[in-house]
Amino acid sequence: MVKTQRVVITPGEPAGIGPDLVVQLAQREWPVELVVCADATLLTDRAAMLGLPLTLRPYSPNSPAQPQTAGTLTLLPVALRESVTAGQLAIENGHYVVETLARACDGCLNGEFAALITGPVHKGVINDAGIPFTGHTEFFEERSQAKKVVMMLATEELRVALATTHLPLRDIADAITPALLHEVIAILHHDLRTKFGIAEPRILVCGLNPHAGEGGHMGTEEIDTIIPVLDELRAQGMKLNGPLPADTLFQPKYLDNADAVLAMYHDQGLPVLKYQGFGRGVNITLGLPFIRTSVDHGTALELAGRGEADVGSFITALNLAIKMIVNTQ
């Protein structure tokens, strides 16, 4: 890394395990400066509950970034709306969570931070606070005015991107259009090259229907939509294999010769990845004008403040973001 970079972290739902995980992250040295967008008392109280040392240093944007030393975090303060009891949701803190996301996103857009790592949020409490909220991915897409974003989850062994995300199953077929596939594959291909350092990405593409449509006998979306798009993009030089039946695609003879899989919908691709690497996975938002990674698990309210939360996914998300920073320099 040419110079030390700043990475901003949002712990997510304050009553959940996000603050625990951030405190655990602070127990080791990092080659980047970790700027945590959060309430100071929340972090120090959670550190005390866990019996872990934590010193908060003020964020100084005009000073050179410094590698993070063990037992410390750099704090960009955002005040809680209500006091927090670990494991107990408070509706007003839905506003607090969104404020942390907005500040972190804006800092990435204005060049303060090289990447953003997000902890788990509770979508229900944010919506209960009167803020329409579908998820991190959609929030950052809108705030950054990105034309289109793509959700990808990854472990060390497997990357799975989604053509559609949070749609009811009955709406998926209508959503799979030539325009959508062109856009999604272009973003996936571009970010695999620029953020992952893969010169010529090899992408496996799932069919939509069982057996990838069985030659049109089990649905015609492959023939009518997916195959023509893949043929066009192959003619432009992209290395695309598919559409392949999703029930047989996830095996070594295919995956060993691929850099990523494109699934047509959420529950087509993610169960395989989460079964293979739950707790080690990372959620990446492709298509944003900055690097964003996230844990692949929820708020786990019942574990908050107990010292039982596994920091593995957060560590993996941060390490991946650091690698992506290097690739983009």
UniProtKB/Swiss-Prot annotation:
BP-aspect Gene Ontology terms: pyridoxal phosphate biosynthetic process; pyridoxine biosynthetic process
The protein's annotated pathway: Cofactor biosynthesis; pyridoxine 5'-phosphate biosynthesis; pyridoxine 5'-phosphate from D-erythrose 4-phosphate: step 4/5
GO cellular component assignments: cytoplasm
Reaction catalyzed: 4-(phosphooxy)-L-threonine + NAD(+) = 3-amino-2-oxopropyl phosphate + CO2 + NADH
Enzyme's top EC category: oxidoreductase
Cofactor: Zn(2+); Mg(2+); Co(2+)
Main location: cytoplasm
Note on how the cofactor is bound: Binds 1 divalent metal cation per subunit. Can use ions such as Zn(2+), Mg(2+) or Co(2+).
Compartment(s) where it occurs, according to its Swiss-Prot or TrEMBL record: Cytoplasm
Quaternary context: Homodimer.
Protein name: 4-hydroxythreonine-4-phosphate dehydrogenase
The organism of origin for this protein: Shigella boydii serotype 18 (strain CDC 3083-94 / BS512)
Gene that encodes the chain: pdxA
